[in-house]
């Protein structure tokens, strides 16, 4: 599974820092981080969007430097967008505060000496895709004082481009990232006709205040990138429908969701591939914007999450109908809870602090803990900078292990799963016959 792209394919043409187009008011100078924000390491969320053929949108038809023009267009719109997303133009003052000093976001312009299809069609695509992400940044720990947003635009020989973003997890989650991308792309797309002013709502520490739980020091996630690998799996609509029908009949669960059946199958197959199979636990992250009262709008920026989990202590627990039945039960329980006062993620962080370990490390005595982030129904494939929908949206390969990321495949056609496991476990996992039955 070892594979690396030659560094000679990539040449950095320009590196600059993009400041907000207007100064941040002094009243907004310091952005307070919530308890959940503080519990996260200073990592970036890395993602990239591939646009196969970009037609130049030139006011000056004599301009022949396409990369320079595209970069200028994106830089101008990014500068305008950062006025509303001002914390991402600042720096971490400490683990509790962002200094919104308009330092700016880092912006890289890169040429890649191959066609986009060579990357997208590569047998090790999840590794090949990393060529369009800023070097050494995906999932890295961002030191205090570093940029909280890093953007790279990469132009391929075929004329296609990739736009990648490393977005500080300290300030926002996957929903926050999508809000930013949609706003930035809208400003880019409509720059000649309207003056869009994005209106994100930063909640800071107003929902999960550190006054309740106390402040935290920044946790450091230590893992060996060379020992962790990512696998991209596609569950086509027809096979996914067959899996859902099978599980519904055998479990009695009405209309099992795509995320329920796929995460259960991944959990079962990953656990089976582990050298120490049982007991195991599967932890699902929840976006709680619509679960708390009063409901928060989708444009709320922050880490607004909770968790629910299921466990397996014997082989009967690992049967798909049982797993899906338990997932449905636990998510229903989660929706009945007060997700501010009874937030399971906060309870796990507090318990981990008490025991001097990282969250989800040997959780409740379970050595095998898998996490699942469900981004299905998050419209990443609608992010349009003016060149149509992306051909592919990818997540940067990183040092995480025992992690599943689910999202729509090409605007709702099935599910794409990014699975991160230890490389020895992955070699067993990807040969599982039950898994192979339902993937493309």
UniProtKB/Swiss-Prot annotation:
Membrane-traversing stretches: none
Q: Which Gene3D superfamilies match?
A: Chloramphenicol acetyltransferase-like domain
The molecular function terms in GO held by this entry are: aminoacyltransferase activity
A GO biological process this protein is involved in? alkaloid biosynthetic process
Q: In which tissues is it expressed?
A: Expressed in fruit 20 days post anthesis.
Q: Which InterPro entries is this protein grouped with?
A: CAT-like_dom_sf
Enumerate the catalysed reactions: vanillylamine + (6E)-8-methylnon-6-enoyl-CoA = capsaicin + CoA + H(+); (6E)-8-methylnon-6-enoyl-CoA + 4-hydroxy-3-methoxy-benzenemethanol = capsiate + CoA
Q: Which controlled-vocabulary keywords does the entry list?
A: Acyltransferase, Transferase
Q: Where is the active site?
A: 169 (proton acceptor), 384 (proton acceptor)
Q: What is its EC number?
A: 2.3.2.35
Does the record's keyword annotation contain Protease?
A: no
Q: What class of enzyme is it?
A: transferase
Does the keyword section mention Repressor? no
Q: Per its database record, what is this protein's job? A: Involved in the biosynthesis of capsaicinoids and capsinoids natural products, pungent alkaloids synthesized from phenylpropanoid intermediates in the placental tissue of chili pepper fruit acting as repellant on herbivorous mammals and conferring spiciness to hot peppers. Catalyzes the biosynthesis of capsaicin, a pungent component, and of capsiate, a non-pungent component, from vanillylamine and vanillyl alcohol, respectively. Can transfer an acyl from 8-methylnon-6-enoyl-CoA to vanillylamine forming capsaicin and CoA.
Question: Belongs to which family?
Answer: Belongs to the plant acyltransferase family.
* The protein's name in its UniProt record: Acyltransferase Pun1
Identify the gene encoding this protein. Answer: PUN1
